[in-house]
């Protein structure tokens, strides 16, 4: 693995479902099962918004919501249908089944999309000493449990995998290897990497002991190219990044406004990045603007207490 890839993916270890980085941060990725917000009643939508707003008040300092849109994998569904057709004795039903499969294949190639939604957050504790590790893990566990409870109130379940380390590595593999992951399942890729690394060390699989392999080897792409100013290339896929500033989107929006972004289409990821600011600084900044505006329009003097009354 090249040095540029190692620097771009500073993952030191994946342990207990948490990502430890070389700059001493602890990161967690949770996958959220979505609901159809548009089909909820007005009262249900209000309840969901209030629960989500309550969670944001206690959310970690740095959080990221990420949606990934890809072509739907219809192979398993088609395989299941073909197995059913093989057991079917009625020729008419068999013909209808074949027609249904043809329709799925045609639609699947053009329109079938699948979306995955992730919540990503990190510990506010920087791991510098051994004693920091347990504190950081305790903090992250508490944040994770709170997120599960609040999102459940919103109607969203957090996926709980049997093997959290494998689940986390599989997500990273999918994110960094968009092209390869469509054709090569994660576990198959892991076995392939083990064979490659053992071959490089002149070790024989099945006879010699498998050496210690850094976790990043199992999800890092084979190639990354940052030489072009307008795009990057990762795993044979071209990426462009568009950034909407915090004040570049209307501050007042209707419920469900993110669906416009999420439904942008195949190959479009949406990242919403939130960072908690220092409340005292925010109060001072907002109250100063309030005083300036009121002084300008009303020619009066105000204090920072006005902001407290409004908040």
Residue ranges and their predicted role:
Residues 1-311:
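Extended, folded cores of ATP/NTP-driven motor/assembly subunits in large transport
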